[in-house]
């Protein structure tokens, strides 16, 4: 599985605006750090497949 992180305010998945992760733990770390840097903004971890991306979880620092 591939995971990516982006702010919840983006709405839909943006493969060019996200930050790609090596695995789910890495995605959680990215999301937490990004949320903390943005004052506690909601981040979405996306599970990215060959056909579509699915909102997998929400992270807030």
What are these regions (language model features)?
Residues 1-17, 44-48:
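Short aromatic-glycine-(Arg/Gly/Cys) micro-motifs in beta-strand/loop hairpins
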Residues 17-19, 59:
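Solvent-exposed serine/threonine-rich low-complexity stretches and specific carbohydrate-binding patches
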Residues 33-61:
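Short, mixed-charge low-complexity intrinsically disordered segments
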Residues 20-25:
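Conserved aromatic
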């Amino acid at each position: 599985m591939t995971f990516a992180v982006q702010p919840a305010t983006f709405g839909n998945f943006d493969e060019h605006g996200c930050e790609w992760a090596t695995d789910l733990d890495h995605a959680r770390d990215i999301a937490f750090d990004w949320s903390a840097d943005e004052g506690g903004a909601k981040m979405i971890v996306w599970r990215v497949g060959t056909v579509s991306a699915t909102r997998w979880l929400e992270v807030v620092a």
